[in-house]
């Protein structure tokens, strides 16, 4: 053994080796998605969105994005809800998104963003926490509210970014869709810039994200996104 050969601290090498492996795995898990995105090593397809939770809101949202050639997939463990998404001709995954089967069978490299939008706020936060390291902490979003919490301080530890500012609950979004709220895609031009867009929108319009000419998606609630510009397509 190394100890028998007189190597100093030989007994500690096993512990050092274990610690090195553990740190390597941890860093790999938390940086793989963001690093691949930064180095442009992800799938050559356009950036897509993984929705967790099939509902009138997510189905309408996904249909509008699909019309803009944004890859979308809705995952849900409820057959009745997922069937509605299938009838809307959307790609679906039937099963528990937090299961081992989902991690093995879903090609997550297709998705640069995720929206957790079930009727369970705690579950939405759990999903975002689980997928954050792989997709990117700043690119996992959720609906709902977490009472008694400083949301900003929790963004990079528990849960996801709020999809809306201020946050909206599942019930609020469902009622909006039932009342006729729908998604629109508006392309900005030199003549019709963001200022004119904002001035002509009806009260209650929410800008959720915009699609860059490159296909990249920027979410309005993300700090540092700025404002959409010429050539961008706003989803509101």
Q: Where would I find each of the regions flagged by the language model?
A:
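Cytosolic regulatory regions of ion transport systems
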Residues: 1-236
